[in-house]
């Protein structure tokens, strides 16, 4: 770690979830592309015995793709304020950093930042329409958010929530994985150990249920191709993998995958069925024929927002308990309009970030 950084980033960039890893890396690369020095603030709290920080593929990812000097040590909550001596500004985001129950004791609202520091939010998500903020914490959270000089959020409903609840203005920008350049993604894909030869239907189901299983089997039968089930990135939770394999016993499991295999699995798939937000995002990015199952456990509103802005709500099943078999879902997708919207959203996100670095301090 160096003595000085332009920006310290607080987020879930270190997590074993594939989407979190790619989201955080996109933010790192994007901010650095503006010529800024970046410190990625590691998972706060005590890392002792934390399997996510000792045995996951994410540990290898951080070592491989980040400059080690750009990664902080683990600070306990009561020492995060020491980062003020190293960072001129702080950035929260992206992903569900403002979903209160997973905000690391409110530290994703950057309460440790000193007055006079520039505070930015880069595509932060509340996860749900109200961020699950309890009534007793609402006023305190509002006081933290009003300190930000520039706020962008990932979903339009978050923009409305900030205005209605706190009187705070924000802009909605696209999920950061859409900002990754094609060369970076291609290099990761080429490093994958997973190299499929035959067409396959990819399943990326984070929360398997019997109703999802039965619906998926109908699509597998109709497509007449083998199914591959990509397991969750949290390999330190073997019971989760076991349940996924049992629920999808008609599919070949792809486990112990890193982000390279995750990307390759989506890139090469002939068809995708997923209940993951980032699974949906990469299906769009890679021009897949896909079916997205809204996931209320992880914030169904996020799916509606992303697919609505990119003009692809026709690929969304909103109710995971009612998944129809419809041959229209099997048809190829014309991505011309979706790509136009993605280009527009990318330009907007980059323009917002450029303005945010120049915005007056609150």
Functional labels for PLM-detected ranges:
Residues 1-362:
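Active-site anion-handling motifs in enzyme catalytic cores
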């Amino acid at each position: 770690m160096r003595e000085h950084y332009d920006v310290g980033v607080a987020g879930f960039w270190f997590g074993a979830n594939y989407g979190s890893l790619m989201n955080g890396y996109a933010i790192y690369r994007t901010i650095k592309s503006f010529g800024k020095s970046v410190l990625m603030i590691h998972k706060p709290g005590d890392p002792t015995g934390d399997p996510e920080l000792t045995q996951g593929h994410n540990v290898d990812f951080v070592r491989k793709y980040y400059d080690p000097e750009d990664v902080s040590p683990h600070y306990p909550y009561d020492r995060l304020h020491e980062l003020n001596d190293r960072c001129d500004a702080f950035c929260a985001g992206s992903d569900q950093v403002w979903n209160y129950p997973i905000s690391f004791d409110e530290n994703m609202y950057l309460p440790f930042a000193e007055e006079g520091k520039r505070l930015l939010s880069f595509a932060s998500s509340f996860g749900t329409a109200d961020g699950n903020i309890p009534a007793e914490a609402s006023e305190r959270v509002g006081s933290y958010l009003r300190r930000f000089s520039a706020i962008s959020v990932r979903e339009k409903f978050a923009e409305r929530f900030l205005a209605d609840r706190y009187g705070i203005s924000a802009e909605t920008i696209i999920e950061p994985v859409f900002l990754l350049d094609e060369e970076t993604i291609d290099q990761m894909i080429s490093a994958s150990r997973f190299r499929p030869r035959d067409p396959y239907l990819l399943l990326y189901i984070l929360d398997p249920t019997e109703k999802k299983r039965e619906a998926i089997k109908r699509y597998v039968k109709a497509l007449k191709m083998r199914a591959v089930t990509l397991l969750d990135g949290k390999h330190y939770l073997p019971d989760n993998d076991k349940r996924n394999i049992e629920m999808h016993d008609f599919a070949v499991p792809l486990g112990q995958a890193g982000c390279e295999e995750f990307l390759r699995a989506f890139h090469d798939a002939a068809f995708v069925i997923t209940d993951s937000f980032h699974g949906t995002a990469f299906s769009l990015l890679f021009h897949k024929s896909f079916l997205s199952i809204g996931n209320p456990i992880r914030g169904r509103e996020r799916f509606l927002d992303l697919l609505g802005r990119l003009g692809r709500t026709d690929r969304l099943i909103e109710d995971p308990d009612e998944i129809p078999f419809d041959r229209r879902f099997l048809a190829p997708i014309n991505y011309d309009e979706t790509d136009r919207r993605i280009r527009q959203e990318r330009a907007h996100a980059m323009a917002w970030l450029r303005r945010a670095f120049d915005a007056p301090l609150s």
